[in-house]
Amino acid sequence: MKFELDTTDGRARRGRLIFDRGTVETPAFMPVGTYGTVKGMTPEEVRATGADILLGNTFHLWLRPGEEIMRKHGDLHDFMNWQRPILTDSGGFQVFSLGDIRKITEEGVHFRSPINGEKIFLDPEKSMQIQDALGSDVVMIFDECTPYPATEDEARKSMQMSLRWAKRSRDEFDRLKNPNSLFGIIQGGVYEDLRDESLKGLVEIGFDGYAVGGLAVGEPKADMHRILEHICPQIPADKPRYLMGVGKPEDLVEGVRRGVDMFDCVMPTRNARNGHLFTSEGVIKIRNARHRDDTSPLDTKCDCYTCKNYSRAYLYHLDRCNEILGARLNTIHNLRYYQMLMEGLRGAIETGTLDAFVADFYTSQGREVPELVD
């Protein structure tokens, strides 16, 4: 992978990630394909929304279908018929989400399979081996996602273990002679000094990109903004910056304003299946009765297949009848909305008009622009 940085507007950055399988324009949003599929979508449909890269889930793909089946197909690209870049998370966050059914030690994590209760052990080395089998273009180190809330001492211990796991991940990645890219993950909770220590340790190990982890796990939005404003300027400028698991459209806007290059989140697809649709004027709840006889499209500013061909009344009808097509059309729209938002942000950075773009984004929804600390 090669990262090119074209221009900046304030802290916001416009560039691209160049892979053998294709180029990813940044800032970029990655749709989430947890089990090797963006729910309800064919790869061609996902690509048509403007997606350059997808995210796959190491933990879930390891449990089902497993490494052996993946290697029989070649890799995850061949298995799911997506011949463009794929980033896979390491499984750390999913293990964190298991709660009481997992035990974290220095060696790794012991837990029971959420599928059949089988005892399983996952460590940095195994995570690297699984992601090698997946053929991930971007591999993430195995880390512990620091919970919120956590005391500073708890966050320090978690972060320092993640640093030790980062070194083990790097060593195993190199031992496997994996030709792809490996990203480090900055931890430290809401504590700036711990974030500094984490980044310093990761840079000493050396990675192809740096992710900010452990945010959007329950902390106030102001804390997320504060940590991003503090840590992003310290990340090496020639490396991509990835904010993991974020988020709402406004979170993408605020992340870009603070120098983030990459995002992922299940929100556009999950919300689509629940009838919550993003538009240039805010969120529409399509199952609300006021849409029952509305012949207008979801968003007159959207060029997606759904908005060009169907009315709000039809989408309301599909939702009320629990038709599969409704979830699919909603997903197409939400994914396209996210990609159009990223296209707009990239264009605004290129032309030096990001402030105006951000102001229009918020005012069109009747909201105030959040303060950005200089």
UniProtKB/Swiss-Prot annotation:
Gene3D superfamilies: Queuine tRNA-ribosyltransferase-like. Zn(2+) binds at residues 302, 304, 307, 333. Its EC number is 2.4.2.29. Pfam families: TGT. GO terms for molecular function: metal ion binding; tRNA-guanosine(34) queuine transglycosylase activity. SUPFAM superfamilies: tRNA-guanine transglycosylase. NCBIfam families: Q_tRNA_tgt (TIGR00430), tgt_general (TIGR00449). PANTHER family: QUEUINE TRNA-RIBOSYLTRANSFERASE. This is Queuine tRNA-ribosyltransferase. The gene is tgt.
